[in-house]
């Protein structure tokens, strides 16, 4: 998005406090949704005594999350509120490390893992992930490329986790 688009979006949310509150609430709820459902998935795997899948669904996502975190530090891409003269709607003091979005990476990774285990929850999380990506862009903390890369890498990490489980 460019400066004109961000300005229009910011002005809309500044004029409409209810919409602004909904945006912030959506950011918190969608983030929490993904992060609460991941331990639930692990608990389901544990209760089903699917230890091989449990190990794959813990170890590989952890390594991928670490790899994304290191990559973000190395690339150190500026955030929209650093590159453009805008105030982000989602308050964030962090500088750089915008690419890829770790929030979006995480929810798409968790969605893919759930999809491999139980499709309805996976589909729900994919939809939640799309909304989270939109919220993060509208909120001014990520560019579209950041969230698209996060989603793609999250799905890839989830598929790798499932593939490793299948070949073990």
What residues fall within each predicted segment?
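Transmembrane alpha-helical segments of multi-pass membrane transport proteins and ion-pumping complexes
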Residues: 65-69, 73, 155-162
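Transmembrane-embedded, aromatic-rich helix segments that form part
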Residues: 36-39, 125
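Transmembrane helix-loop junctions and nearby membrane-interface residues
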Residues: 42-49, 73, 121, 137, ...
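N-terminal transmembrane-helix/juxtamembrane module of multi-pass inner/ER membrane proteins
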Residues: 1-37, 52, 68-96
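Membrane-embedded catalytic cores of phosphoryl/pyrophosphoryl-handling enzymes
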Residues: 85-168
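Small-polar-interrupted transmembrane alpha-helices in polytopic inner-membrane proteins
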Residues: 59-72, 123-135
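Interfacial segments of alpha-helical transmembrane regions
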Residues: 39-67, 147
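Membrane-helix interface segments
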Residues: 18-19, 49-53, 80-81, 118-123, ...
């Amino acid at each position: 998005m460019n400066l004109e688009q961000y300005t229009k979006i910011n002005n809309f949310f500044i004029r409409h406090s209810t919409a602004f509150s909904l945006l912030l609430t959506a950011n918190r709820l969608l983030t929490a949704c993904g992060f609460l459902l991941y331990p639930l998935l692990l608990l389901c795997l544990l209760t089903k005594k699917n230890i091989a899948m449990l190990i794959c669904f813990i170890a590989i996502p952890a390594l991928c999350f670490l790899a994304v975190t290191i990559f973000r530090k190395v690339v150190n891409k500026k955030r929209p509120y650093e590159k453009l003269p805008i105030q982000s709607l989602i308050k964030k003091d962090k500088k750089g490390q915008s690419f890829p979005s770790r929030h979006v990476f995480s929810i798409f990774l968790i969605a893919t893992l759930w999809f491999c285990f139980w499709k309805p929850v996976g589909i729900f999380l994919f939809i939640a992930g799309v909304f989270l990506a939109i919220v993060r862009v509208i909120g001014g903390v990520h560019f579209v490329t950041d969230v698209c890369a996060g989603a793609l890498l999250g799905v890839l990490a989830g598929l790798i986790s499932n593939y490793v489980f299948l070949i073990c």
